[in-house]
Amino acid sequence: MSKFTKYFLMEASDVIAYVKEKLSKFEHAKGLKCKEIGDGNLNYVFRVWDKKENMSVIVKQAGDTARISDEFKLSTNRIRIESDVLQLENELAPGLVPKVYLFDSVMNCCVMEDLSNHTILRTALINHQIFPQLADDLTTFMVNTLLLTSDVVMNHKEKKELVKNYINPELCEITEDLVYSEPFTNHNKRNELFPLNEGWIREHIYSDKELRMEVAKRKFSFMTNAQALLHGDLHTGSVFVRDDSTKVIDPEFAFYGPMGYDVGNVMANLMFAWVNADATMPPGAEKDTYMDWLQTTMVEVIDLFKKKFLDAWDIHVTEIMAKEEGFNEVYLQSVLEDTAAVTGLELIRRIVGLAKVKDITCIENEEARARAEQICLKVAKSFILRANQYRTGRSFVETLKEQSMHYAE
């Protein structure tokens, strides 16, 4: 009798038994091994492999609380959302997400392609690796998954069915708290401030009423603007890379929201990589080459996104009023404003809030870390307060470089 007819959190030995029962190609495998490899905040991730037979899979299971904190009570439905979204994204952006082999609504888990021959992008960037096709792949992914799930392209009734299918209240609440509220109010007393910057943050983040007003506006846009199906957590820890391949993973935060949320997350996390390199690499040609590539990548993320977005609009638009001359540019500009604001929000929340990024925390020299944080926080305020001024990739990068040089003076 199967032991997998009632939900429980699996251990490695359970996962081996699970794949042997559920996946025919593993049924008679003799040398299966399993290791829990998850380092995220929410789920349990296992790699199962048979070296002799050269086959492997990933098993991802959802618990009913977040790993980051038991305070976050979560619906295990998020794994259903993730499985569904990955399959949809594979239709919209083929080859840019892992394949899903199985979803199990009883065990609240899914089985998917093993990407062990790739590296987590955040880790690769901290190690100062270069991936020439990164911007091209990420912009293709974002344009195809965002524009093609919007009212511009989809039948409106079908789009509303997707909105209903991807209602994701528990994970949206995490974003509403950790991105749009707590970094500016600390009302839940969970913020973690680096001591050298604590005074500056209290004066220039917590006490800035103009900033808080702009964040309030963006929060309500996030909660009410069901523009497109977002990945919802598109940082560099949600991307696997190798020289010839990019794979976007972990869309468990997916829901219908403003497109710029995904684009802004990508931009902010590339900036974390930039300040990390600025703080940790010794001066010289290697540092110059790497930081130049990061700057070019940031420029291309915005500029390629714009070009591909308008090209895809011309090909796929179905909404009659969206065909009005010039409306595509107006629509795109609103996406870019959201992008700038979210870039700022992500920069602030990862420094002030509960969920840190290794790009910052691994900077061992305290003065260098304080400098990196302040560069991020200062450019973040500009992105939020002057979001309508950021229309090109170069405008983002110039603000980052100017703040870095200003800090050095």
From Swiss-Prot:
By its UniProt entry, which SUPFAM superfamilies does this protein fall under?
A: Protein kinase-like (PK-like) (SSF56112)
Provide the alphabetized UniProt keywords.
ATP-binding, Carbohydrate metabolism, Kinase, Nucleotide-binding, Transferase
NCBIfam families reported in the protein's UniProt record: MTRK (TIGR01767)
Stated role: Catalyzes the ATP-dependent phosphorylation of 5-deoxyribose into 5-deoxy-alpha-D-ribose 1-phosphate, as part of a 5-deoxyribose salvage pathway that recycles this toxic radical SAM enzyme by-product to mainstream metabolites. Is also able to catalyze the phosphorylation of 5-methylthioribose into methylthioribose 1-phosphate, but this enzyme may not function in methionine salvage in B.thuringiensis since it exists a paralog (MtnK) present in the methionine salvage pathway cluster. Does not act on 5-deoxyribulose, 2-deoxyribose, ribose, fucose, fructose, fructose 6-phosphate, and glucose.
Record's protein name: 5-deoxyribose kinase
Q: Which GO terms describe its biological process?
A: carbohydrate phosphorylation; methionine biosynthetic process; toxic metabolite repair
Q: Which domain of life is it from?
A: Bacteria
**From which organism does this entry originate?**
Bacillus thuringiensis serovar kurstaki (strain ATCC 35866 / NRRL B-4488 / HD73)
Q: Which gene encodes it?
A: drdK
